[in-house]
From Swiss-Prot:
Keywords: Repressor, Stress response, Transcription, Transcription regulation. The keyword Membrane does not apply. This is Heat-inducible transcription repressor HrcA. GO terms for biological process: negative regulation of DNA-templated transcription. The gene is hrcA. One of its GO terms (molecular function) is DNA binding. Belongs to the HrcA family. Negative regulator of class I heat shock genes (grpE-dnaK-dnaJ and groELS operons). Prevents heat-shock induction of these operons. The lineage of its organism: Bacteria, Bacillati, Actinomycetota, Actinomycetes, Mycobacteriales. HAMAP family: HrcA.
């Protein structure tokens, strides 16, 4: 806000905060009379009217053409979010329920699906979680099983709980000794390494391998490198899209909601929104045009990263109309992300 005495500035911010709170709660444009009645602003309605005129001139609030009241602009929401000092914490009972629900997930996929369902319920918006990015995970174990003497099953297990199985046709028969040697070589090259490093190590194996294993290793390493470097981080879990249609009017112009829903279908768009916020413990709020996605101009996105012991596995967050309960949404996103991290760390 412009240069003015801090007490005037603070009071004006209180007026803006009151307008945001009332508009989010009621969907009704707010007039100065209502503000004075509902909020203990400690000044006359003439002062509030004057403050509102300044807020409007500075672009923080605007007058919808059919009403005498005012509603926040994206700039107004931004100012509000930047100055949120207290985020509404979830109650102890809510936090306990969230943790229990996540802990009963049977595996990584289930925990993430549960996280999305929870976020959508808590915020009454669309929730989205990105599967752990491959680059962040490590190989926990590689298992080699002979299905028959010329056919192997390779099983790669990562620390994020992902299991990949691939069958390799060898074109020749391997005996038990060769199989043991193959297991040892692959284990030494891959176990405990980040996927990119494991893939590089496997690609080099055929050159240094004993002669009788070379052909087998060329086939095995080709399949493994493909497995390790493919990109399942393109996978997203979405929940609560019905919440958007319930709030269709909040998306402003007719057709805006359809644009938002179409943008959500584009995984690349959503991944870009999530990728920008990968600090665990910090929540990023992008309002309207700040999303830098043309179709999302009428929406806000609240995102964070989730992960285990300081390393980020993926992004998650909530998408809804710019008229959203920011303090509540920020708290929900932060809490669910934190607990997903805790649950995954215990696995």
């Amino acid at each position: 806000m412009g240069p003015m005495s801090s007490s005037t500035e603070d009071r004006r911010f209180e007026v803006l905060r009151a307008i945001v709170a009332d508009y989010v709660a009621t969907k009704e444009p707010i007039g100065s009379k209502t503000l004075v009645e509902r909020h203990n602003l400690g000044v006359s309605s003439a002062t509030v009217r004057n403050d509102m005129a300044v807020l409007e001139a500075e672009g923080y609030i605007t007058q919808p053409h059919t009403s005498s009241g005012r509603i926040p602009t994206d700039k107004g929401y931004r100012q509000f979010v930047d100055r949120i000092s207290e985020v509404k914490p979830l109650s102890a009972a809510e936090r306990r329920a969230i943790l229990q629900f996540l802990e009963s997930g049977v595996d990584l996929d289930d925990v993430l699906r549960r996280g999305v369902r929870l976020l959508a319920q808590l915020t009454r918006q669309v929730a989205v979680v990105q599967y752990p990015t491959v680059s962040a995970s490590t190989v926990r174990h590689i298992e080699v099983v002979a299905l028959n003497p010329a056919r192997l099953l390779l099983v790669v297990i990562t620390d994020t709980g992902r299991v990949d199985q691939r069958i390799v046709e060898l074109g020749a028969v391997v005996d038990d000794d060769d199989l043991s040697a193959l297991r040892a070589l692959l284990g030494a090259a891959m176990d405990g390494k980040r996927l990119a490093a494991a893939s590089a190590a496997v690609a080099e194996l055929p050159e240094s391998a004993p002669q009788q294993l070379r052909d087998v290793l060329i086939r095995v390493s080709t399949v493994l490198v493909e497995t390790l470097v493919e990109h399942p981080e393109e996978r997203l879990v979405l929940g609560g899209t019905a919440n958007l249609t319930r709030n269709a009017a909040d998306f402003g112009l007719p057709g805006s909601l359809r644009q938002v829903l179409e943008a959500l279908e584009e995984q690349v768009v959503v991944l870009k929104l999530l990728a920008a916020a990968q600090q665990p413990g910090t929540v990023t709020v992008r309002i309207g045009e700040e999303t830098q996605v043309e179709e999302m101009r009428s929406a806000s996105v609240v995102t964070t990263g989730y992960g285990v012991s300081g390393s980020v596995l993926g992004g998650m967050g909530v998408l809804g109309p710019t008229r959203m309960d920011y303090p509540g949404t920020i708290a929900s996103v932060a809490t669910v992300a934190r607990y997903i991290g805790e649950v995954l760390a215990e696995r």
